[in-house]
Amino acid sequence: MALRIGVLCGGRSAEREVSLRSGEAVYQALMAAGYNDVVKIDVGYDLVEQLKGNEIQVAFLALHGKYGEDGTIQGLLEMLDIPYTGSGVLASALAINKIATKKIFKMEGIPTPAFSVITKKEVEDKSLQEAALRAIKEVGVPAVVKANTQGSTIGITFVHVKEKMAEAIESALKYDQDVLVEQFVAGTEVTASVLGNNSPEALPLIEITSVTGVYDYQSKYTPGMSDHIIPPRLPQDIQEKIKELAIKSFLSLGCRGLGRIDFIIRDNQPYALEVNTLPGMTATSLFPDAANYAGISFPELTDRLIKLALEQ
């Protein structure tokens, strides 16, 4: 196919190595799908020169974390008039902002765990202890304290007892001006992959379980401590409800192309946690795994994502 595709990967975020693996997998899949003119680009300060020099006609984003899924690279590509895979500037910026995402969930009537917002200014104007007491009053313990716009492994603390709340907030404030304190909901974790633009579809759900048999947030964020079960061990009507909420979440933020929405299910009630606009794209990642179960091979998936990018 006479279309020059640039696979953008690497970058400067803490998830650089994962992004490089995603980039290589996507490169191979696009070639297998029949795209013969594909260039891998390690994103750096010379990105504009690389895009222009290689005469890139469409960008496949295999980036993760800061500068990749926060709207930054999307804005640059918009200025250069280069179509790209995944969500646009606003949806990307909203999805990486955990607090903004939670507020949108609340406005749209999408169930989500209770939360409290702590700002650096509040801590400076009042005190760390006062902010911690407010979070405990509004959310309670156990809770998860998260830096607002960091990746899932950075600036996160699981708080079991009230006495540790202030310390967790202080730690998160090292990474961000705003902190999300979220109620911990024990239950089954399920991730929903969504594919499409204006009329997206939810792919088969994947249940994520702890290898130790005890589910908690730490299991979620520790590599090698979780297994993927597809389809999840949930009643069919609950699975359909999760898919509906996933599509609603996707559209509420204005996402397009692809996205992955994480849920916790307790007593058959799904709670939306967050939206990932650029999920991992190695052949064994969650999103391609869900697509594969739906009968969409990895090469076919990359082809569909390119076509969705060109629809915009």
From Swiss-Prot:
Mg(2+) 2 binds at E274, N276. Mg(2+) 1 binds at D262, E274. Pathway: Cell wall biogenesis; peptidoglycan biosynthesis. Binds 2 magnesium or manganese ions per subunit. Residues 102-307 form the ATP-grasp domain. Its EC number is 6.3.2.4. Keywords: ATP-binding, Cell shape, Cell wall biogenesis/degradation, Cytoplasm, Ligase, Magnesium, Manganese, Metal-binding, Nucleotide-binding, Peptidoglycan synthesis. It is found in: Cytoplasm. The keyword Hydrolase does not apply. ATP binds at residues 136-191. The keyword Transmembrane helix does not apply. This is D-alanine--D-alanine ligase. It comes from Desulforamulus reducens (strain ATCC BAA-1160 / DSM 100696 / MI-1). The lineage of its organism: Bacteria, Bacillati, Bacillota, Clostridia, Eubacteriales. The gene is ddl.
